[in-house]
A protein has these predicted regions:
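Conserved helicase motor "Helicase C" RecA-like lobe of SF1/SF2 P-loop NTPases
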Residues: 497-522
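Signature of the SF2 helicase/ATPase Hel1-core->accessory helical subdomain module
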Residues: 53, 57, 68-75, 190-195, ...
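Conserved RecA-like P-loop NTPase helicase motor core
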Residues: 461-473, 522-635
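Conserved interdomain hinge at the start of the Helicase C-terminal
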Residues: 409, 463-497
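A substrate-engagement module of RecA-like helicase motors
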Residues: 1-7, 40, 58-217, 227, ...
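A contiguous, basic/glycine-rich beta-loop/short-helix subdomain that forms a polymer-engagement track
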Residues: 193-214, 227-238, 340-463, 473-474, ...
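Conserved pre-motif I regulatory segment
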Residues: 1-35, 50
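Walker A/P-loop NTP-binding motif
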Residues: 23-27, 45-58, 75-80
Length: 668
């Protein structure tokens, strides 16, 4: 065992940081799971020093959600390498951002398909003596002739491979000399993600980084590499490791639940059924079940059209009624028989699509996955059957509502797992949500930033609770808070529970902010990036503005607003999810699981976390100064206030509108 200090790259520890690293080291040494709530400025990325000290030649995997978090760890490990030049690390981002091959469809399917055809061609040519595929005139000609929109071969993958004599007879495929050389270079001198494509210069970036990853101490990867079981198992097989030999670190762990439930949920739209019918038309002679499945589709369409009469935008549908309606007058006895036929048909369609360079997910595949998950939901209460009604029609969904089983499986299968975040508050509630009654080490650190650099207030006279939304006095006071806050110098952000509430108060407040540049978060994600860039660039020109955004939206999480980019944030309202029958069923599930605390864990805790994430955009370095405002009296309720970080509870100034004006007026 080595000392933490051996891998700690800084001259001194921040308050609480040494203790955090010792806790992480103990868990890494003994095995198990730890959850660490470490506010911005705690130096939580240095937890990697604990894992390095305890690794005993085992591989370390760091899972991150965004490229900015990836960059944080790349930077941290570069500092560690100054003390330990022998340390080797590499990153693996998703193929979507690494793949240089053009074409339509899903990048993972495209990769699978072109690798299959490329391997077959390369092996055939190798048997005829062409051991360096990238230099084989025949392969070069085939690449030149193929349809670039529907590729069957990947020149980047082909350049990554070569053949050598096998030990017994024939030849075997190995990484090309160029690939191995570049992999060694990227280990010796890490290449930033934005420069990777240029560095690879004709070689597959993913193959290159995978080759490098096999020979490194640390691999940084994105959430989907870890939480998608199929991708994780394939990845670990390629790395030549078993989970029990890997030390796992999960960053921004407050996001784990949403990512896992998203991966394990599946949707079906009305247009999927229309496309499925077209796909089945050409299958009747190729699969005996095609006709029988085709006769089921009108029943599915009828079921979805029946839901169009609903007055609810989202509601539960009964899977038993769904099953009876689909099977009625069909050739099937139960849903399992339909799924079996669909699986067979899907395999034929997918194989045929790949041969034609078509790599989109087919509607039949989506229908198969939906009905398979729906059948599973009958015996698993962690799944709800839900429909949503919008402008495009009805969408059916089998929704996972509990990430605990999958997360426990992932974390428990590794030698150890450390989950860190700046917003795992209260950490005991997150522990129960993620791991139930399992033994988990928890730690919550204080805020390491100077107290004098921040002002925290909470309003006691306003709310966005549904019962008060039509109250004119309440609405006027909320508008007054927004106006008072917006008059402060510097860039300000105001977050609302929903777009509807945002638009209401933007309409009321913006006309009074004549001397301020105002930016309103667009619903369209494509427009959000450029508008945000304009807002953040104001201070560099000696200007400032006010940003109206949604809690949990595009402008509230995973963004680093350092220095003068953001001087204050206000959260208007407690951003609870809309209450409907689906939400009530979710609450009932968690009450059954956790008793009275269940509603808090599944309903209130996510709202608190969205609020903390929004406020957390302001103070990113010890030198940053800012005002943090909770403009909602429900934050003063005992259960909600008690869930806020300790430093926030201690420093919070309770205000009405008059006191609020005085308090922020004296802030300098």
């Amino acid at each position: 065992m080595e000392s933490i200090d051996t891998y700690f790259p800084y001259s001194e520890y921040r308050p609480g940081q040494r203790h955090m690293l010792e806790v992480a080291a103990q868990v890494a040494r003994a095995g198990g799971i730890a959850m660490i709530d470490a506010p911005t400025g705690s130096g939580k990325s240095s937890v990697v020093a604990s894992l390095l000290a305890e690794r005993n030649k085992r591989k370390i995997v760091i899972a991150v959600r965004t490229v900015s978090q990836l960059t944080t760890f790349i930077r941290e490990l570069e500092l560690v390498r100054k003390k330990r030049p022998d340390l080797k690390s590499v990153y693996l981002v998703g193929k979507g951002s690494m793949c240089p091959l053009g074409g339509e469809g899903d990048v993972y399917r495209r990769c699978e398909g072109v690798k299959k055809f490329s391997n077959a061609l390369m092996r055939d040519r190798a048997d005829k003596g062409a051991l360096t595929p990238a230099k084989d005139p025949f392969i070069i000609q085939q690449i030149r002739l193929m349809d670039k929109e529907h590729p069957l071969l990947c020149p980047y993958y082909i350049a990554s491979k070569m053949f050598v004599p096998a030990e017994s007879m024939g030849v075997k495929m190995v990484p090309s000399t160029a690939l191995r050389t570049k992999a060694d270079r990227v280990i010796a001198s890490p290449v930033p993600p934005r420069e990777l494509a240029e560095f690879c210069a004709g070689i597959c970036p993913y193959e290159l980084m995978m080759q490098a990853a096999r020979n490194t101490d640390i691999v940084i990867l994105n959430y989907h590499h870890l939480f998608d079981r199929e991708i994780r198992e394939q990845l670990y097989a390629n790395l030549g490791v078993e989970p029990q030999d890997v030390l796992l670190l999960i960053d921004e762990a407050h996001n784990c639940g949403d990512v896992i439930t998203g991966i394990e949920s599946v949707e079906l739209e009305q247009r999927d059924l229309e496309q499925a019918a077209r796909e089945l038309t050409g299958m009747r002679k190729r699969h005996k079940g095609a006709d029988a499945v085709h006769h089921v589709l009108p029943r599915l369409t009828e079921f979805m059209k029946g839901l169009e009469n609903s007055q609810e935008a989202e509601d539960w549908f009964d899977p038993a009624i769904f099953n009876r309606m689909i099977i009625k007058e069909s050739l099937y006895k139960n849903m399992d028989e339909i799924v079996d036929d669909l699986i067979g048909i899907s395999e034929v369609i997918r194989e045929n699509s790949q041969k034609n360079g078509q790599f989109r997910e087919t509607a039949i595949e989506r229908l198969t996955e939906f009905l398979f998950r729906l059948a599973q939901s009958a015996t698993d209460t962690a799944f709800l059957t839900v429909y949503q009604k919008n402008e495009t029609g009805i969408t059916l969904e089998v929704r996972n509502i509990d990430p605990a089983a999958s997360l426990s499986d992932v974390c428990g299968s590794h030698a150890c797992c450390i989950l860190i975040s700046g917003t795992l508050s209260p950490v005991e509630s997150f522990r129960r949500y993620y791991f139930g009654s399992a033994a988990v080490t928890t730690l919550a650190l204080p805020n390491a930033f100077p107290k004098e650099n921040r002002l925290v207030t909470c309003s006691n006279d306003i709310t966005t609770a549904y019962s008060m939304r039509q109250n004119k006095e309440n609405t006027t006071r909320i508008t007054d808070y927004i106006r008072a806050f917006s008059l402060l110098k510097g860039n300000r952000a105001i977050y609302f529970p929903s777009y509807q509430i945002l638009e209401t108060y933007a309409g009321l407040a913006v006309p009074h902010l004549r001397n301020r540049k105002v930016f309103i978060e667009p619903r369209d994600a494509g427009e959000a990036g450029s508008a945000l860039t304009q807002f953040l660039s104001l201070p560099s020109r000696g200007e400032s503005g006010v940003m109206f955004a949604v809690s949990g939206g595009k402008w509230s999480e995973g963004l680093d607003y350092r220095g003068e980019m953001l001087n204050g944030a206000m959260v208007v309202g407690l951003p609870l999810a809309p209450f409907n029958r689906v939400r009530r069923m979710l609450i009932e599930y968690y009450r059954h699981k956790f008793g009275d605390e269940g509603e808090f864990i599944c309903y209130t805790l996510p709202a608190i976390n969205r609020s903390l994430q929004a406020l957390g955009r302001v103070l990113r370095t010890p030198e940053d100064r800012g005002v943090l405002v909770l403009a909602e009296k429900r934050f003063l309720e005992k259960r909600v206030r008690g869930a806020l970080p300790g430093w926030m509870q201690d420093e919070m100034i309770e205000c009405d509108i008059t006191k609020f004006r005085d308090v922020i007026g004296s802030w300098k």
